[in-house]
């Protein structure tokens, strides 16, 4: 290796960004932070810049940029501050960047992630919404640019590790019968259905296994997160929706499985810590220490599996239907979910109304073909408008 890889971290102050920085800091001769971006936790972004001395930082607006630039100057740092989506795309596609951690949550991460792909970077994809929204357009860009796309979601990273290196020839060609996505079941896996009506945001964010941000914690509680991962798996591994099965596995030790036609089932196991898939993708095809403790099977004792209940988890059903419909449906599903989850976290709707909003949006609009990025964002905007109108009529 001639020198350290230069890394841009999109979404540096979130849980994935912080875990990435933890792994990077363990290997200073391998990795050097080139750019960090943040949206709301700007004091933390300043602290990260002081600690990791990136060449660039990106923030959402000019007011914040001026303050951060002054604070960096006071700390005797020459980090340059960029602004907005243009700044995100610049640090994602910069010629000096080798790898990009795409960890901005939601639709906001699509353009900068695509910028990294189109520049032919090694893209560590934690922003599942980018692929859910743009699907075939995203994968076409990967193929045309020669970018290396490595999944960071623990489930997709597990599948990637369990598939043969030439899986791009087609799952059937390499003997794969099905992919099994594991899910913890979230905090309400055994909650009586009649109690779900009164679930609070704090309860929904109290995940029993993983430490995550608030939006993805709610998605995990509703199992929309698993639904989005189902759609993501279809695009990453060229699978049909009926080739992807969701299995509830409360211990979150098996991160996913691949079932082969000869009866073999390969699984990837590990402690539930995002530093494992991050380290795997950063170093791929090599391996480096992630800082994660070794798995102790004797302490775990047993592994359990359950079939998801669609009455309890209607968002999983809606996501599978969107995957089967294709076209604009996944982008609309994602947008409606983002609006509904934000309203729930703000106390404007009840937990069970999240799925209701999404279903109403999907039923309102016919599925259309998505032939360009403008069509993706048009579907996204339409779904947000419809979800917003529902809130105007019904929110508390």
Swiss-Prot record:
Q: Give the source's domain of life in one word.
A: Bacteria
Q: Which NCBIfam families match?
A: Dxr, PRK05447.1-1, PRK12464.1
Q: Which residues bind NADPH?
A: 13-16, 127, 129, 213
Q: Which positions bind 1-deoxy-D-xylulose 5-phosphate?
A: 128, 154-155, 184, 207, 220, 225-226, 229
What's in the keyword line of the UniProt record?
Isoprene biosynthesis, Manganese, Metal-binding, NADP, Oxidoreductase
Q: Which GO terms describe its molecular function?
A: 1-deoxy-D-xylulose-5-phosphate reductoisomerase activity; manganese ion binding; NADPH binding
Protein name per UniProt: 1-deoxy-D-xylulose 5-phosphate reductoisomerase
Q: Which reaction does it catalyse?
A: 2-C-methyl-D-erythritol 4-phosphate + NADP(+) = 1-deoxy-D-xylulose 5-phosphate + NADPH + H(+)
* Protein residues bound to Mn(2+): 153, 155, 229
GO BP terms, alphabetized: isopentenyl diphosphate biosynthetic process, methylerythritol 4-phosphate pathway involved in terpenoid biosynthetic process
Q: Do you know which Pfam families this protein is assigned to? A: DXP_redisom_C, DXP_reductoisom, DXPR_C
Q: Which residues form a coiled coil?
A: none
Gene name? dxr
This chain's function reads:
Catalyzes the NADPH-dependent rearrangement and reduction of 1-deoxy-D-xylulose-5-phosphate (DXP) to 2-C-methyl-D-erythritol 4-phosphate (MEP).
